[in-house]
């Protein structure tokens, strides 16, 4: 347990996470100061009166006078004000670091470019199925500090690369990097290796590292060591086994579950199930209850979610695909009897869209591209692409064209913030229009 008595603490960034940090310090007899670059950040109305606040910009004077800065994952450590504070020897941490210093129960930690929310939720469900008192959160659901509880027997945290950059005390009982594909390149000027380096911090002091046999970038810098357990499509300690037209989850050569018993579908979800099982095994959860959880889990909204099946057409909301790798995961091994009508677009965060090209061949694909980077996406295969300003226009354009056997898939490969509040709002809008048009 760290002691913050008498420390001058400054919190950057409000919202739910910022408020959880404020409450954390107030409970320990320390009154922090809060700043946010937004004029009226979310949660401002919930900030206790006693807490000094500065909004609309950063307050360099407060920062340079601080003993400890708690930075929101939304602000880059490379920001000149934070750089100056770091150069002056001021400690900069995030909420996850505060959490790790206090947590008394083992932590399962999950990061990766795609699939992390599904895997985090699944491991949480496996723990619940075993009757374990579990706290699930971090980058999804509740901020980590709100999970702190003496009664808790296990924590399962989803961590972003931004959160890992400010964390040094994590000692996970099991940690994984699911995959590393381009994302947030606007925050990583030195490219993919800089982004990977942030993710690799999750393995420091971890007891078991669950690595992706199909993605070398998920391996520890010095290569696999005795802490590593692997998963993969065809290889790895945990892998998929295809026999007589059926697919099984297999662990070290032993078939443990036929995927037809799972509610989740799609190859990317079968590998998510493998990782969750590997993490649950490493955390000491009983295998039987973990497998039972796999047969009941229905998946998360906006993640390859079938929102309508009508007249032989499936409308699928994969709005959570906010980067190229996530859309690749949706398209990889996808089977459509008729034509795939694929909706792409939004803010691409300076990503390279070219990896998508290999999935867009053949006569049975139509692209509908919208939003800020619509033109760039339409250029992937111009002869089958149409460009509109908004997603709604795209859906009204494609609706009269769909035939039985077709699939309409929103898997945009982009963030939603150019036209929507968040990916959830984009997904809800898609679902609403699907029900109207389908």
Curated annotation (Swiss-Prot):
It comes from the Bacteria. It is found in: Cytoplasm. Keywords: ATP-binding, Cell cycle, Cell division, Cell shape, Cell wall biogenesis/degradation, Cytoplasm, Ligase, Nucleotide-binding, Peptidoglycan synthesis. Pathway: Cell wall biogenesis; peptidoglycan biosynthesis. Pfam families: Mur_ligase_C (PF02875), Mur_ligase_M (PF08245), MurD-like_N (PF21799). Its EC number is 6.3.2.9. It is an enzyme of class 6 (ligase). Cell wall formation. Catalyzes the addition of glutamate to the nucleotide precursor UDP-N-acetylmuramoyl-L-alanine (UMA). Belongs to the MurCDEF family. ATP binds at residues 112-118. It catalyses: UDP-N-acetyl-alpha-D-muramoyl-L-alanine + D-glutamate + ATP = UDP-N-acetyl-alpha-D-muramoyl-L-alanyl-D-glutamate + ADP + phosphate + H(+). Its main location: cytoplasm. GO terms for molecular function: ATP binding; UDP-N-acetylmuramoylalanine-D-glutamate ligase activity. GO terms for cellular component: cytoplasm. One of its GO terms (biological process) is cell wall organization. The keyword Secreted does not apply. This is UDP-N-acetylmuramoylalanine--D-glutamate ligase.
